[in-house]
Amino acid sequence: MKKICWLATGGTIASRPSENGLVPGFTPKEMLEMVPNLKDYAHIDCYDIMQLDSTNLQPEDWQYIAGYIEKLYEQYDGFVITHGTDTLNWTCCALHYMLENLAKPVVVIGSQLTIEEENTDAKFNLNAAFAMASSEKIGVFAVCGGQIIEGLWAKKLYLSLIHI
């Protein structure tokens, strides 16, 4: 069975509503319990590396994410990064250029709805991300709105629709 590394960075997918809007709400281990079939794809290790609204991500955050992948690279067959949708495309692009000689899938995933909301896209997107991360594909990919695309070409078109 493949071994996948799940890096959580924040975003709507892992949030819950509060009186002041969305706030960090779930660790990757808690989300894994909410979508237990993800374990069918691979053995999954979870790392909660930051809890940021993706609109606040800076270049040093991309360096931190890339560094985490480089540090754990030999231990895993693929990587899934849960992320906010506002800058998901920028993170994909940064990782594409920062991770030289990449020979594994790195999948950056977001959702427009929190994982606990009814009719959420989060669970579908997580399944697509782990399927891609456990595949033989190589490169950085984006998953959002039920689509899997090469991360370098991802862009967010609309703030309120469930796609990238």
Stretch-by-stretch model annotation:
Residues M1-I162:
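Active-site histidine-anchored catalytic micro-motif
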